């Protein structure tokens, strides 16, 4: 048989870039297959055809019976098995050498001085092929090549074991009966050293089973651990690093905000509000301007606690309601003398209050209520004193009822 040194050197280079189980597999291939096949098996099967004899004198009968008994020699069958099983490993070795050569070329280009002319080409440097210890790291495309290498080796092992069983079986019998043409009848043929050949057949079958078991273990070790680790690498799209790299500060949509940022503050300005003067009594407030805030309700008033009262009506009806309110205040004046005044409301005019609010012109305090004793709500607003009316008697009474202090007696009419 030919020289195995060339194939041995190639497989030795591949052993440097394999896992621990892969190195054990290559050791089994070297010692228990190539070495045993080259040293002993060829000597055992050397007289295979010359010592195959049949009890007939018919020319050609012995040759056709040998061809039917052994379609292919065991030695040549095992040589083909070694070549086919080693081919995926050689392909993986070629991939490794290609990556190493590409890295060497890249380093040579980096060492060269940069060209003065031409725009600078932006390219992403690939990950280094070798790790810190100088070994080729099995990751990425190289990892996939290694996994396919193991899978094809396993398939070839299974195929050759099944082929050997269907071609010869796993045992050689000393007697082989042949009735193939041109034999005149069924003839008996005898095989030389059948027991020794059977031992070698079983030995090579055991080595093939060990190699198959190592391939399965390597698939478990590499396919379920390293391949899973490669699939969950930190460069996947849903990791924080990839999202941070893809998000640009000025490239996003202007309508989208970062997840942790506060909503933008929107400032809406209104013109300053001025208290209505005496000359503007009876005029409707301009649309679009905010209404003046209403002071809080007195704490002692019956009704809903804490809710500021409102006097119905729009801003345009303030002048029409002022005389009616003054009359109500004059009628309630006899009842107010027997009661004590409640504490004044200290809410400034600018204090905010919810809901629509209405005010009496001229800064008068207004009260509204039903005649059957229901509680009324009093609103107080502090403004500059209005001009004195024509009747001084009535104005003095009105000034008493519309003073800065609101009394509890004003609530009952």
Curated annotation (Swiss-Prot):
Official protein name in the record: Gap junction alpha-3 protein
Top-rank taxon: Eukaryota
Extracellular membrane side: 41-71, 171-198
Cellular component terms (Gene Ontology): connexin complex; plasma membrane
Provenance organism: Ovis aries
Record field: transmembrane: 20-40, 72-92, 150-170, 199-219
Subcellular location: Cell membrane; Cell junction, Gap junction
GO biological process per UniProt: cell-cell signaling; gap junction-mediated intercellular transport; visual perception
Pfam family, one: Connexin
Residue numbers on the Cytoplasmic membrane side: 16-19, 93-149, 220-413
Disulfide bridges in this chain: 54-189, 61-183, 65-178
Post-translational note: Phosphorylated on multiple threonine and serine residues. Phosphorylation may have a role in assembling connexins into connexons and gap junctional plaques, as well as channel gating.
A GO molecular-function descriptor: gap junction hemi-channel activity
Tissue specificity note: Detected in eye lens (at protein level). Only detected in the lens. Not detected in heart, kidney, liver, or lung.
Protein family membership: Belongs to the connexin family. Alpha-type (group II) subfamily.
UniProt keywords, alphabetically: Cell junction, Cell membrane, Disulfide bond, Gap junction, Membrane, Phosphoprotein, Transmembrane, Transmembrane helix
């Amino acid at each position: 048989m030919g020289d195995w040194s060339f194939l041995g050197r190639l497989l030795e280079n591949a052993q440097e870039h394999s896992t621990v189980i892969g190195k054990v597999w290559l050791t089994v291939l070297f010692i228990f297959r190539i070495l045993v096949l080259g040293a002993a098996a060829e000597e055992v099967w050397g007289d295979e055809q010359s010592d195959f004899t049949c009890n007939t004198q018919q020319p050609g009968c012995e040759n056709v019976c040998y061809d039917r008994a052994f379609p292919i020699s065991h030695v040549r069958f095992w040589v083909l098995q070694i070549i086919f099983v080693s081919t995926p490993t050689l392909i993986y070795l070629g991939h490794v050498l290609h990556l190493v050569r590409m890295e060497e070329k890249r380093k040579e280009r980096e060492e060269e001085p940069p060209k003065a002319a031409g725009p600078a080409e932006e390219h992403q440097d690939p990950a280094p092929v070798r790790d810190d210890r100088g070994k080729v790291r099995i990751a990425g495309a190289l990892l996939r090549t290694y996994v396919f290498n193991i899978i094809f080796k396993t398939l070839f092992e299974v195929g050759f074991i099944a082929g050997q069983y269907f071609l010869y079986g796993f045992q050689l019998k000393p007697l082989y009966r042949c009735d193939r043409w041109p034999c005149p009848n069924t003839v008996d043929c005898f095989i030389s050293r059948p027991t020794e050949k059977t031992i070698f057949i079983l030995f090579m079958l055991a080595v093939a089973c060990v190699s198959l078991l190592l391939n399965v273990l390597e698939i478990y070790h590499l396919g379920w651990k390293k391949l899973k680790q490669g699939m969950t690498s930190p460069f996947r799209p849903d990791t924080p690093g990839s999202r941070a790299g893809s998000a640009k500060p000025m490239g996003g949509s202007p309508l989208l905000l970062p997840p942790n940022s506060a909503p933008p503050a929107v400032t809406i300005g209104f013109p300053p509000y001025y208290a209505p003067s005496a000359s503007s009594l009876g005029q409707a407030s301009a649309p679009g301007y905010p209404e003046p805030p209403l002071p809080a309700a007195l704490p002692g008033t019956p009704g809903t606690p804490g809710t500021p009262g409102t006097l119905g009506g729009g801003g345009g009806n303030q002048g029409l309601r002022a005389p009616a309110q003054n009359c109500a205040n004059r009628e309630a004046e006899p009842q107010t003398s027997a009661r004590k005044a409640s504490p004044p409301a200290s809410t400034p005019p600018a204090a905010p209050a919810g809901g629509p609010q209405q005010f009496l012109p001229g800064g008068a305090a207004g009260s509204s209520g039903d005649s059957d004793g229901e509680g009324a709500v009093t609103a107080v607003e502090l403004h500059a004193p209005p001009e004195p009316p024509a009747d001084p008697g009535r104005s003095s009474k009105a000034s008493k009822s519309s003073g800065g202090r609101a009394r509890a007696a004003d609530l009952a009419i």
